[in-house]
C-alpha cells in the first residue's frame, strides 16, 4: 500500500533525513478490537514481529488496547517489531493504547530496528502509552524505539506516562530514536513522569529532531533524564517551532553531572543548535539540573518568542552551585534571544548549593568564549532579566548589538531590554551577586531601550549607543565597561526610583578608556507618580549621576551635560518646577547633584474632581424637573381640589471636554402634592419630592446623592381684555376675549452628597457635602381654542417664561491619605424659555394629549467652580465643570387620562438638548380629585 506522504510532511528543514527514511510501499496488516489484549487474567500476549523490506503498515479498524502484556513473565520481544523495513500504524480515527508492558530488555510498545527505517503513528484520535515499560522493568529500554525516524503526525490526543529506560546505557524513557518528528497533532500531547538512566527522560534523538505545527498544548512534566535533558535529550541540531503552547515543569537531570533540567542539546565534538520559535506560549517552570542549565543546556540556542515566554523558578546545583539557573550555553556556544510577538521573562531562577549562599539568582550562564548573538525585542515587546546573567572569565570579542534586525526581516526591533533587581526578596537583596550581570562582550545599542532598574549593575567589555536609542537608568544602577570605552548619545534617568543618596553610575575600568555623553540628561517618570510625590512640594537636592574613569577625570567628556544638564521636561501633571545642577570633580570622577525648585501644581485628571461643581448642575436638573411636573399637574383635566403622587426618573449626561471628564447624573424618586382651585379659577399647588441619585465622571469618581425638594405653584387666569392695550377696532375686541394664563413657582432643594474617589495609585478617598438650591419661575401663556372638529390640536398655548436657579455647594474636606479640601461654590442661571404647548382633547373631554416645544436662552450665568487643595501639601487648583451651552431646545409630550370622575392618570416625557449635554426625564402619576 502506498503511504500518503503529505501526512508526514513537517515544517522544519531539519527533518529532511526523516522523510527520506519513510518507505513508499509496505504490506498492510489489520488491527481490530479483537486484537486487543488484557493480561490481568493470566493470558499471554504474543509479540508481533515482521521482516518486510517494503515495511509493514498496521491499519486499525476499531479501538485497540494492550494491557498487562508480559505480566508475570516478560515478553520475548517488543509488542510490535519490524526488523527490515519501516513500521507504520495508521489509526483511521481510532484509539490505540498500551498500559503496563514488560518486554524485558526490549522496547515496550513498538520498534523499528533497521538503520534509517522509520516508526510512524498517524491518524489516531488517541494514543496512550502508560508504564510500557514501567519502573519495575529493570532492563527496560523505552516505549518506542527507532533506528531511523520516529514520526507522530496528524493525531489527536497523545499521552506518554510513567515509561522508563532503566538499562544503564539507554537513552529516552518514552522515545529513543535517530530522528524525530512530532507534527500536525491537534489535541494535547503530554509526557509525564517518564525517566531514563541517561539522556532524555521523555525523548531522546541522536540526530535531527522537530516538534512543530501542533495545535494542542504540549506538556512535559516531572520527567527525569539522569545525565541530561529531563524531558528532551538531543545530540544534533533540533527545532521546536510553530506550536500552540508548550509547558515544561518539574523535569530534572539528577546525575552528579546532570545538565539541562528540561532540554539538553549538546554533543562532544559537535556544535548542535536548538531552535525554539513561533510558539504562541512557552513556559519553563521549576525544572532543575545539577551542573548546568536548570531548564536548558545547549551548545547553541536560538529562541524567538511568538507569545509570552517565561522562565520561572528553575534551578541548577546541588551540594555546589551549578551554572545557569535557567539556561546554560556551552563553551564557544551561542545564544540568540528575540522577543518578536511576546515578552521573554526570567524570574526566580537560581543557583543552589548546601553552603552559603544557598541560593543565588541567575538566568543565564555563558561558557568560555560563548557569546550572545542577538538580544532584541520588537516594538512593544520586552525581555525582562529579573535574574542576572553570568559569564565565564573568557569572553568573546564579537560585538553584541542590542535590537539589531535581520537584513531580511520586516520587524522593527525597538523594544526594551530590562535588567532589574526589583523583584528580589529582602534577603536576596543583601547579596551583590543577585544584582550583577556580566557579559564579556562589547555592547552596542542600535535601537529601542536598554533599561537598568532596581539597583542592578551591568558589566560589559565596552558600550556604544546609536542615535535614537535610549539608555534608561534608575538611581542606584551602574553601567561598567571593563576593557573598552563608553559612548552615550541619550541617557534617561528614571525618577520613579529616586531615593536616599543613590546615583546613576557610569564607569570605565580600562586604562585611559573614555566616557562620552553628547546630550543633556533626560528625566523620565516611568511610574507616572514622581511629580505627584509630596516630597517634591519643597525644594530638595539629590546626588544624581557619577561618571568615573579608571585613569583621570580628563577621560570624561560630558560638555553637553555641563552646558545644559537636563532637557526641558515634557509637560506633566503634579508639582511643577525645574532642575538646577551643580558639579563636583575629583581626580577620576565627575559628579552631578540636582536641585529641584518647585513653582506650582497641575493636578492630574484623577485629582481634579470636577464632579463636585458638576453636582450643582445635577441639582439644577432635579429642581427643574420638579417644576415641569408641577406645571403639568396644573394642566390636569379636572382643576378642582385634589391630591396627587408621581414617580419620576431623570438622566443628565454631558460629554468630555478639554480637561473635564464626562459627567453623568441619574436620579429617581417620588413626588406627592396637593392642588386647589378657588372660585376665580386660580390654582394653588404644593408638592414635596425625594430623589435618590448617582453621579459619575465615567472615570474614577462616584457620588451618591439624596435630594429633598419642595415647590409652591400659583396660577391665575385672566383675559387680555383686562389689560391696557391700544385700540385696533374689531381686532382689539377679538383679542380681549383671549384667555391669559399667568403662573409663578417657587422651589427649594436640599441635596446630601457622598463621594468616593477610587484612585488607581493611591488609597480611596471619601467626602460628603450638601447643596442648597432655589428656583423661581414666572410665566404667561395665551389660550387659543379651536372647535372640537378641528384636525390635529384644539388648544394652542404660546408661552413666555422667566426662570432663575441658584445652587450653592458647601465647603468640605475629604478623609483619606490623599484627601482634598474643597471651598464652596455656586451656580446661577437665568433663562427665558419661549415656545408653544399644543393640546388634543378627546371628544368626551375626558382625555387629552399635549406636546410642548420651546427654545431656551440663558441670559445670565455664573458657572460653578470650586477651589480645591491637597490637605497633605497645600497645593491647590480650581475644579471647573463644563460650561453648558447657553441655548437649549426642550421638547415634551404628556397625557392626562380620566379613569373616573375623581381619578386621573398622567404621564410625561421630556428631552432637553444643550450642545453636548442631554437631559431626559419621565414621570407617571395618579391624581385624586374631590
UniProtKB/Swiss-Prot annotation:
Record-linked InterPro entries: Autotransporte_beta, Autotransporte_beta_dom_sf, Polymorphic_membr_middle, POMP_repeat
UniProt keyword annotation of Transmembrane helix present: no
Entry keyword Lipid biosynthesis: no
SMART domains in alphabetical order: Autotransporter (SM00869)
Compartments reported by the entry: Secreted, Cell wall; Cell outer membrane
Keywords, comma-separated and alphabetical: Cell outer membrane, Cell wall, Membrane, Secreted, Signal, Transmembrane, Transmembrane beta strand
Domain Autotransporter intervals: 636-930
Superkingdom, natural source: Bacteria
Membrane topology: Peripheral membrane protein
Listed GO CC annotations: cell outer membrane; extracellular region
Gene3D superfamilies: Autotransporter beta-domain (2.40.128.130)
Signal peptide: 1-26
Coiled coil stretches, renumbered: none
Stored Pfam families: Chlam_PMP, ChlamPMP_M
Family per similarity comment: Belongs to the PMP outer membrane protein family.
Protein name: Probable outer membrane protein pmp8
Naturally occurring in which organism (per UniProt): Chlamydia pneumoniae
Classification of source organism: Bacteria, Pseudomonadati, Chlamydiota, Chlamydiia, Chlamydiales
Gene name of this polypeptide: pmp8
